[in-house]
């Protein structure tokens, strides 16, 4: 089966900061005064892991450069708009796009402002016409040693925006360093707020981490 011939695709696992169209990265860099002294092929390599990569930490490094470009409301709205437009052109009818609001606050935005900017990009494309792509947003909490309060805010923002663009919360990041068990209370809180949950597990810590 040739996937290119299908026009009813669904994608349930997309990271906004890991799925940007190449032209979006180039345009954002130009707008922000960043000179990309590399070919398109070199830029794609900078943003992508090689085939067969099995190192989660190598995957995570590929998010670093896009994140530097995604620190303003305008940039975030554009990223979501451009990604959904590209997916729609590929025949995707429904997708769930995830990102960590706390990673986009380096220039002073609150997590709520980050979410509102991404939602603006979503609503500029999704559901505009009956045949338009439909999409949901998943808000990622991050594994780490000093961001417990930020994760709590993410869960509370998910509750605020649930059913209005946001459909779930997630846990992402360096699994081997920060086991899932450490976040039991956080996701008990999400359950208390009746927020659907998905968790990255088994990527670096084996099958036992999935059972956790």
Identify the role of each PLM range:
Residues 201:
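Cytosolic ligand/metal-binding cores
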Residues 1-195, 204-211:
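Metal-cofactor-binding active-site regions of metalloenzymes
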């Amino acid at each position: 089966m040739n996937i290119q011939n299908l026009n009813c695709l669904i994608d349930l696992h997309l990271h906004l900061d890991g799925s940007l169209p190449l032209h979006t990265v180039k345009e954002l860099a130009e707008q922000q005064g960043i000179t990309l002294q590399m070919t398109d092929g070199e830029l794609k390599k900078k943003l992508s892991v090689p085939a067969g990569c099995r190192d989660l930490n190598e995957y995570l490094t590929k998010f670093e450069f896009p994140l530097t470009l995604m620190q303003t409301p305008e940039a975030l709205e554009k990223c979501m708009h451009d990604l959904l437009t590209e997916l729609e052109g590929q025949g995707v009818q429904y997708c769930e796009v995830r990102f960590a609001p706390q990673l986009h606050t380096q220039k002073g935005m609150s997590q709520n402002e980050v979410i509102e900017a991404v939602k603006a990009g979503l609503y500029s494309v999704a559901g505009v016409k009956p045949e338009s792509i439909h999409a949901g947003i998943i808000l990622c909490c991050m594994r780490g040693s000093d961001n417990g309060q930020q994760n709590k805010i993410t869960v509370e923002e998910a509750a605020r925006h649930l059913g209005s663009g946001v459909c779930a919360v997630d846990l992402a990041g360096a699994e081997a360093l920060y086991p899932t068990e450490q976040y039991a209370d956080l996701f008990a809180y999400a359950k208390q707020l009746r927020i659907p949950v998905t968790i990255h597990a088994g990527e670096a810590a084996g099958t036992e981490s999935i059972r956790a």
